[in-house]
Structures are given as structure tokens and as C-alpha cells.
Curated annotation (Swiss-Prot):
Species assigned in the record: Homo sapiens (Human)
Gene name of this polypeptide: PLAAT5
LRAT domain boundaries: 135-249
Tissue: Highest expression level in testis and pancreas.
Family per similarity comment: Belongs to the H-rev107 family.
Catalytic activities: a 1,2-diacyl-sn-glycero-3-phosphocholine + H2O = a 1-acyl-sn-glycero-3-phosphocholine + a fatty acid + H(+); a 1,2-diacyl-sn-glycero-3-phosphocholine + H2O = a 2-acyl-sn-glycero-3-phosphocholine + a fatty acid + H(+); 1-hexadecanoyl-2-(5Z,8Z,11Z,14Z-eicosatetraenoyl)-sn-glycero-3-phosphocholine + 1,2-di-(9Z-octadecenoyl)-sn-glycero-3-phosphoethanolamine = N-(5Z,8Z,11Z,14Z-eicosatetraenoyl)-1,2-di-(9Z-octadecenoyl)-sn-glycero-3-phosphoethanolamine + 1-hexadecanoyl-sn-glycero-3-phosphocholine + H(+); 1,2-di-(9Z-octadecenoyl)-sn-glycero-3-phosphoethanolamine + 1,2-dihexadecanoyl-sn-glycero-3-phosphocholine = N-hexadecanoyl-1,2-di-(9Z-octadecenoyl)-sn-glycero-3-phosphoethanolamine + 1-hexadecanoyl-sn-glycero-3-phosphocholine + H(+)
Region (Disordered): 1-53, 70-117
An annotated GO BP: N-acylphosphatidylethanolamine metabolic process
Protein known as: Phospholipase A and acyltransferase 5
InterPro entries per the UniProt record, alphabetical: H-rev107_PLA/AT, LRAT_dom
Subcellular location: Cytoplasm, Cytosol
Start-end of Polar residues biased regions: 97-106
The enzyme's E.C. designation: 2.3.1.-, 3.1.1.32, 3.1.1.4
């Protein structure tokens, strides 16, 4: 049975209209021109004047690209660029080891040890720097005190049990004991002058240095018998260095005393001699 044209239009199958596909927007990174030039700006369909004629998306892309183009790239230092090229070509990198004036100033400002500075000052004044095992002669008023150099500006010497008096002083003469002390050379000097004096090296052969130091350190803090004539500070240090306890200071004093005594005896003898009778 057929349908009338009117009925066909009324009961005909109606399909929804599908809009045609829209064109894909151009990619932001796509560019038809050269690599370093910005993409061409598209005009809006609606006529406008000035900036209004550019779409917001196109304006943002163009401004951002212009900003990137206007910022100059940071150039590396010439030396760094040349060094990088030389390394890429297989050459070895050269490291400069020269010190700058600022580095030298920093090193010179480092404080040196106090003892080392004093020894350097003494060497500058022409005084030889003591070596381990050297004998130190200290010039006191009326006598000489002796010590033996050990290390680090320190010496070993004889001192009375009481620190109020020095060995060799009038008070210590009547004491028969002394203690072996390990002290700084500056503390032993008490402002007196001193010198290195190994005067018996030409008479006796010094012991090996390591043996001298070993013997000396074993005596530290020990109490020994003290005698101005037979066991004073010079006897002590000569015994450690040469193995022979000897004191030329006492020998000279005894010799001078013998000479003086001889002169006195000679004068007395001459005075008691009978005088010849003259006519």
C-alpha cells in the first residue's frame, strides 16, 4: 500500500544533521618559514584595525617568540671556549698552578709557631740554631749555667729542688741535691745571653745523637747528687754528650786558685827567708 507524498513527508525517517568537521588549528611549533623567523600572523575574519586585528592566541605566540629572539645568549669566557674546543679535539687540559697575590697574602697571614719564630729570629741574628744533643752555655752573673738541647726549643738541665734558687747560685752551693728538669730554653735563660758550645768535641768523640737523647730523657725528673766541684751542671751535660763528666769551669777555677795559692805561699816563704847580713 502506498503512501501519499504528504504522508511520506510526515512519517519519513529524520536523521540529525552532523556539522562538517572544523579545520585543525595550526600547531604552535609548526612554522612554514625559515627556522629563525616567527610564524606568519593570521588575520581575523572580522575586519579590525591595529592590534585588534590579531587573535589573542596569535598575539601571545608572536610576543613570546619575539621575547625569546631578543634575549641574547650568555657567551662563555674566551678561555673556556678555547679550552673546550681543545679537549674535544683530543688535547689535554692545562691547569695553571701559579699563585695569585691574594693567595700569597693569605698564606703569609697564617701564624707560625712561637718557638719556630724565635729560632728563625736567632738564626737571622747570626746565632746558630741548636740541634738535638747540642750543649747550651748560659752566661749568668759570676758563673755559666749549662743545658743540653733536646727538641722543639726545649732543653734538659739541673735545677735545685726549690725553684727559688738556680743551680750555681750562692744558696745552691750548700745543697747536695738537684733535680733534672725538662724546660723551655726561654724559661731557663731568664734574659741572659747564651750560645751553642760543644767545646769538647775536639777532645772527645760525641755519642750518637739518638743515644744522647735517649740517655737525656731517661734522666728527666730524677733527683741526683749535686756538687760544685765534682757534680755540677757542666759535669752533667758533658756526661750525657760524651760519656765523660767534666767541668772546665771548675778546672779553671781550681787552676786559678792553685796559682793564687802558689803566689801566696811564695810570698810567705820569701817573707820568712833569712835576709843576708850586710857588713
Amino acid at each position: 500500500m502506498g503512501l501519499s507524498p504528504g504522508a511520506e513527508g510526515e512519517y519519513a525517517l529524520r536523521l540529525p544533521r552532523i556539522p562538517p568537521p572544523l579545520p585543525k588549528p595550526a600547531s604552535r611549533t609548526a612554522s612554514t618559514g625559515p627556522k629563525d623567523q616567527p610564524p606568519a600572523l593570521r588575520r581575523s575574519a572580522v575586519p579590525h584595525s591595529g592590534l585588534n586585528s590579531i587573535s589573542p592566541l596569535e598575539l601571545e605566540e608572536s610576543v613570546g617568540f619575539a621575547a625569546l629572539v631578543q634575549l641574547p645568549a650568555k657567551q662563555p669566557p674566551p678561555g673556556t671556549l678555547e679550552q673546550g674546543r681543545s679537549i674535544q679535539q683530543g688535547e689535554k687540559a692545562v691547569v695553571s698552578l701559579e699563585t695569585t697575590p691574594s693567595q700569597k697574602a693569605d698564606w703569609s697571614s697564617i701564624p707560625k709557631p712561637e718557638n719556630e719564630g724565635k729560632l728563625i729570629k736567632q738564626a737571622a741574628e747570626g746565632k746558630p740554631r741548636p740541634r738535638p744533643g747540642d750543649l747550651i752555655e748560659i752566661f749568668r752573673i759570676g758563673y755559666e749555667h749549662w743545658a743540653i738541647y733536646v727538641e722543639d726549643d726545649c732543653v734538659v738541665h739541673l735545677a735545685p729542688p726549690s725553684e727559688e734558687f738556680e743551680v750555681g747560685s750562692i744558696t745552691s752551693i750548700f745543697s747536695n741535691r738537684a733535680v733534672v728538669k725538662y724546660s723551655r730554653l726561654e724559661d731557663v735563660l731568664h734574659g741572659c745571653s747564651w750560645k751553642v758550645n760543644n767545646k769538647l768535641d775536639g777532645t772527645y768523640l760525641p755519642l750518637p745523637v739518638d743515644k744522647i737523647i735517649q740517655r737525656t730523657k731517661k734522666m728527666v725528673n730524677k733527683i741526683v747528687q749535686y756538687s760544685l766541684i765534682e757534680g755540677n751542671c757542666e759535669h752533667f751535660v758533658n756526661g750525657l754528650r760524651y760519656g765523660v763528666p767534666r767541668s772546665q769551669q771548675v778546672e779553671h777555677a781550681l787552676m786559678e786558685g792553685a796559682k793564687a795559692a802558689g803566689a801566696v805561699i811564695s810570698a810567705v816563704v820569701d817573707s820568712i827567708k833569712p835576709k843576708p847580713i850586710t857588713a
